[in-house]
């Protein structure tokens, strides 16, 4: 999986429910951290940030925008 800054990703875990995001939440990579970690920002439908968390590569998958 090739993840770069501004890559759209989907969260695969409920480990961050306390931060307001769970499985299926969509976010964008804003920083690539050491040890294959990624800082991801999740926002609501109005673009207001909900959470900014550091996740591992096994906790996200690249999410292509749907045409819906």
List each model region and its residues.
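Basic/aromatic-rich interaction segments and small domains that mediate binding to polyanionic partners
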Residues: 3-68
